[in-house]
Amino acid sequence: MYMKKVKTPFTFIDLFAGIGGLRKGFEPYGECLFSSELNKYSQETYCENFPGSSVLGDITKIDSKEIPDHDILLAGFPCQPFSLAGVSSRESLGQKHGFKDKTQGTLFFDICRILEQKQPKAFLLENVKNLQTHDKKKTFKIIIRALEELGYYVNVKIIDAGKIVPQHRERIFIVGFREPLDFEFPELKDTKPQLKNILEKRVAKKYTLLDGTWNALKRHKKRHGEKGNGFGYNMANKNGVSNTLSARYCKDGAEILIDQGEKNPRRLTPRECARLMGFPDSFKIPVSDTQSYRQFGNAVVVPVVQEIAKAMVKCMQQGKHRIMITDYDE
């Protein structure tokens, strides 16, 4: 697919930006005006890959009025429980309450206050699949109600990236528009990805598990096997998709191990992790292996985001305030 230059790009902001996966997915269609990320190592990777970007830190200390106007808000926010004590007491007294009461003290509150102040045309929020069931489903219900209370029409879908990258990775995506647009999440085309196609041909010895680590993993798996459960390391199928890459991968790489025949298995390299998340090889990795494993384990799958971005922006052409977007040659 060839992408022509954007004539009049929409604008977006990137909250809880991590290393810029959401931005990477949206950049073909628009311009990022503002970025916020607290972790200093993620900031380093972000700035290395988006030259000229000024990444601000703690979003809780940034006044909403200081954030530039934008068309779309992007955020991969942390999953936190909401305290319902104050809400329950207000209900018992017959007092009205809104998102400020329900979400106070969480980072989701900062998303809400920015949406309230800036009123962008749309937003995309990303989180782990378990957000839907977190805290007996209370967390998710409050999130959706808060977004609707702010005047948005909300769409939700869990998407598994395993059709376009060789990794089983389910994430929940929440899309909202200020207008009742006919939005549908994209159906990902199954490209039959295979793990072997993202593996490097030459890998440094340091990625091979030491005898002590490998023996410990085997003992751990044996113990769980004797108890009748399937916990333990996973030897990845090179002809299929891997397990989900997590931020804990830096510990021992147990969830995705690569068979090396007679040698001990190895963990993925940082570059392989980047590929597993759909980042191009041009994406720079300036931090240590430990930090890079954490960063890619917390990242979004870029091609999934790009498909959602394409669907969102095309849908927004239907609205009252149309946005000029890229023309496509398939």
Which functions belong to the PLM regions below?
Residues T11-I13:
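Conserved beta-strand elements of the Class I
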Residues L15-I19:
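Class I SAM-dependent methyltransferase "Motif I" SAM/SAH-binding loop
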Residues C32-F34:
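Short beta-strand element of Class I
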Residues N39:
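Conserved SAM/SAH-binding beta-strand->alpha-helix loop
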Residues E44-I67:
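S-adenosyl-L-methionine
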Residues I62-I72, L84-C250:
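Class I S-adenosyl-L-methionine
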Residues L209-E330:
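C-terminal target-recognition/interaction regions appended to catalytic cores
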